């Protein structure tokens, strides 16, 4: 779009900050919502995208006053919206583990979409799930949720992660140091992951 020095109320804009608390859309997980507030105006952020060179593009509409280049601003993430996304993302980890337990270790994640109010999880399998298999998967996920299992994140070498049995996304390229997410005291679920998650398995009350 067109580069502008200032934007007034009602204008849709994209803002780049020198640093940000916002999570950008990546890995199938949607970006944060929130507010960016300056001395002379504010904007509602409804999408965040990350460019190839690592810049975070905060997309939204000016809701009051005017925002200008070089303004000093405060960036505030919508905490409830972020919590809902984290809950959904954590649930995908539980779902993948349950699917592999019920159907077999051949099951691999083929894609996903994680939003604040729903998830889509694509996986490899040679047949549609039976009603019995579906019920087993559902029960296993619900049991993990009700257990309130701890969610533990660790950074380690890719070799150490593989030794611990961490699941990796097929076709994904990883660096020498990776983030490993384990759910449960005994690492019942263990995956490489860069998304935002809860500190315990998702509660129906979250």
Which residues make up each language-model segment?
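A glycine- and charged-residue-rich anion-binding loop/surface
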Residues: 1-201, 205
């Amino acid at each position: 779009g067109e580069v502008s020095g200032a934007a007034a109320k009602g204008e849709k804009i994209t803002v780049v900050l020198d640093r940000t608390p916002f999570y950008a859309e990546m890995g199938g997980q949607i970006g944060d919502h929130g507010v960016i507030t300056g001395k002379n105006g504010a904007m509602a952020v409804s999408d965040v995208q990350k460019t190839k060179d690592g810049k975070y593009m905060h997309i939204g509409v000016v809701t009051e006053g005017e925002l200008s280049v070089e303004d000093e601003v405060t960036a505030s993430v919508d905490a409830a919206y972020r919590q809902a996304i984290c809950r959904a993302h954590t649930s995908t980890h539980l779902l993948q583990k349950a699917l592999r337990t019920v159907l077999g270790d051949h099951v691999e994640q083929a894609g996903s979409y994680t939003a604040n109010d729903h998830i889509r999880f694509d996986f490899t399998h040679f047949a549609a799930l039976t009603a019995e298999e579906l019920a087993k998967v559902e029960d296993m996920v619900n049991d993990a949720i009700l257990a309130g299992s701890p969610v533990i994140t660790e950074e380690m070498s890719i070799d150490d992660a593989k030794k611990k049995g961490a699941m990796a996304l097929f076709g994904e390229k990883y660096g020498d140091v990776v983030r490993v997410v384990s759910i449960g005291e005994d690492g019942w679920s263990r995956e490489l992951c860069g998304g935002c998650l809860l500190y315990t398995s998702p509660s129906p009350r979250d």
